[in-house]
């Protein structure tokens, strides 16, 4: 039995209600994004990235469009230090990109950090110390006053060393474990730091509010953020930043609600990599904006490339259900879902609307480098006629009649169920050909000749055999060529059925194109049987379709 009494709430509500953010229903503008993949993400890996891998990852982040990138904790290890030096000395930092470095509010660590920054043009120095009740009590064993003093002294040293270096580095402060800190106290510490830095319009300070450990529901975090946003000093000259983690699975919601509550900036990682359950996934937050018509100002147009690079650099695997980027996120196996998607895609093609509204697909997969054939309609034992028909039509140009699509879907489902596997598009096409196209056993036609009679009648001379036996020739009349051939076969083999469906179309747009015909016949018991015929001669194609339908009875 689990001991629920072992736990209690560890967060603190603001001293006054802060719920103005809840009046907003969406994000209207992208925040400033800061990638922490190379620091927070890297330190969470079983095997941290090598210097070479980090350089390549940095280039990838620049390509995606990040303008602020936390590149590490230079005082933590030689690899971290050398990575920053490599970026600076090899001139790998674009002029419009600012690198961010992390340091504890400890003098020797801050000094080593500045040593690592020598020669860097654009940098954010990010200093932090933990302010939560639990850490004050258990880790540091210090009072609120002592913790505030650590923050202020760290802020002073950052300012002093920046002036000595003759640089205009920007400053960032994080009350680490903000979510476990009393909001009034977090505000006091942050305002004391801001008093040291005296931010201006052309040199804003960053106050970062990390949910170092996610402790509450997202609306609580948003209320804490709103309280800070409303009460920070120098607010017009402060960039309010968030650093959500995902311990309760709500990192994305924390970020989104936090933006509504006044945050200007989000720190996170690609695919949510990071300590424990990870940092907030910037891709999800950004794509959530995109699917509502808000430009995330990051380029995710080649998601497969991003996925491959991330897995290569980190050794991590992306969950197939991870929003927007997982291998199965657009996949529809359910028959009803496939049918709705197929109809939605046809509607989009016919109407060409300005906005995307296809059922079950929140965005157009092609916008992020995915494709319909491999990523959307997937066929297994749960699939239906819509999915099978869509694949055969869009990939192979086969426009099956509705009832024939249904018959083909039953065939595909049966095979998938028997084999316990998903069927690829090429397997579905081969299954269609094996089952419904030009089937010549047990009945087979060897030759047909036609003669025009009076009153529009057609006489067919049909040579055929059954189960490889001797060929026999019979004559029969009909209202058309196909009807005459059908009557000949009925006469020869005493067959009973009604010809109830016939359609045809070209498979290619050229004078020598193959044509395909679809024939449906109804047996006395009311069951439909289907066949397709493919031939440059549409008459021959229709005869082959009829014979196949008879053979499929």
Task: Show which residues each predicted segment covers.
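Short, small-residue-enriched loops and turns at beta-alpha junctions
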Residues: 40, 44-45, 74-78, 132-134, ...
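Catalytic alpha/beta core domains of metabolic enzymes, predominantly
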Residues: 216-349
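Short beta-alpha connecting loops at secondary-structure transitions
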Residues: 135, 209-211, 239, 267-275, ...
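N-terminal capping/small domains of soluble enzymes
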Residues: 1-107, 371, 376-379, 383, ...
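Mixed-charge, glycine-accented linear interaction segment located at domain edges/termini
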Residues: 527-530, 534-553
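Positively charged, aromatic-enriched nucleic acid-contacting surfaces
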Residues: 460-464, 507-530
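Alpha/beta enzyme core
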Residues: 7, 33, 47-68, 84-90, ...
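A mid-to-C-terminal "edge-of-domain" accessory segment
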Residues: 2-39, 293-475, 511-514
């Amino acid at each position: 039995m689990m001991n629920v009494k072992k736990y209690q709430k560890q967060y603190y509500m603001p001293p006054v209600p802060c719920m103005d953010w809840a009046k907003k229903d969406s994000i209207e503008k992208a925040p400033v994004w800061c990638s922490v993949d190379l620091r927070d993400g890297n330190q969470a890996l079983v095997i941290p990235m090598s210097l070479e891998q980090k350089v390549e990852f940095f280039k990838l982040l620049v390509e995606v469009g990040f303008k602020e990138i936390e590149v590490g904790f230079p005082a933590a290890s030689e690899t971290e230090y050398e990575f920053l030096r490599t970026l600076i000395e090899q001139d790998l930092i674009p002029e419009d990109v600012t690198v961010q470095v992390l340091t504890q509010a400890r003098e020797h660590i801050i000094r080593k950090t500045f040593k690592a920054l020598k020669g860097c043009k654009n940098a954010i120095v990010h200093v932090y110390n933990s302010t939560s009740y639990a850490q004050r009590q258990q880790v540091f064993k210090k009072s609120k006053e002592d913790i505030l003093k650590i923050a202020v002294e760290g802020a002073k040293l950052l300012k002093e060393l920046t002036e000595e270096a003759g640089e205009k580095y920007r400053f960032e402060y994080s009350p680490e474990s903000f979510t476990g800190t009393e909001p009034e106290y977090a505000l006091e510490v942050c305002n004391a730091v801001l008093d040291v830095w005296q931010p201006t319009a052309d040199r804003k300070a960053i106050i970062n509010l990390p949910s170092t450990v996610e402790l509450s529901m997202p609306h609580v975090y948003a209320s804490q953020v709103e309280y800070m946003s409303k009460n920070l000093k120098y607010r017009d000259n402060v960039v309010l930043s968030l650093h959500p983690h995902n311990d309760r699975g709500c990192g994305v919601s924390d970020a989104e609600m936090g933006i509504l509550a006044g945050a200007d900036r989000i720190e996170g990682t690609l695919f949510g990599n990071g300590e424990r359950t990870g940092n907030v996934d910037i891709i999800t937050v950004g794509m959530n904006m995109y699917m509502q018509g808000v430009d995330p100002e990051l380029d995710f147009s080649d998601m497969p490339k991003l996925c491959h690079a991330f897995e290569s650099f980190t050794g991590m695997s992306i969950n197939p259900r991870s929003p927007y980027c997982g291998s199965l996120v657009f996949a529809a196996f359910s028959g009803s879902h496939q049918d709705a998607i197929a109809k939605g895609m046809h509607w989009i093609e016919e109407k060409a609307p300005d906005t995307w509204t296809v059922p079950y697909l929140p965005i157009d997969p092609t916008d992020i480098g995915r494709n319909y054939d491999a990523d959307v309609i997937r066929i297994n034992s749960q699939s239906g006629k819509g999915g099978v028909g869509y694949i055969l039509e869009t990939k192979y140009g086969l426009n099956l009649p509705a009832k024939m699509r249904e018959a083909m879907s039953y065939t595909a489902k049966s095979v998938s169920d028997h084999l316990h596997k998903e069927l690829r598009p090429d397997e579905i096409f081969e299954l269609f050909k094996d089952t419904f196209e030009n089937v010549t056993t047990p009945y087979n036609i060897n030759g047909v000749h036609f003669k025009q009679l009076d009153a529009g009648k057609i006489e067919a001379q049909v040579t055929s055999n059954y189960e490889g036996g001797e060929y026999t020739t019979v004559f029969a009349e009909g209202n058309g060529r196909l009807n005459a051939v059908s009557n000949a076969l009925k006469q020869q083999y005493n067959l009973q059925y009604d010809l109830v469906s016939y359609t045809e179309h070209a498979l290619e747009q050229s004078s020598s194109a193959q044509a395909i015909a679809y024939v449906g016949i109804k047996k006395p018991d009311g069951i439909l049987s289907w066949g397709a015929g493919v031939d440059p001669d549409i008459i021959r194609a229709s005869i082959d379709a009829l014979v196949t339908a008879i053979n499929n009875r």
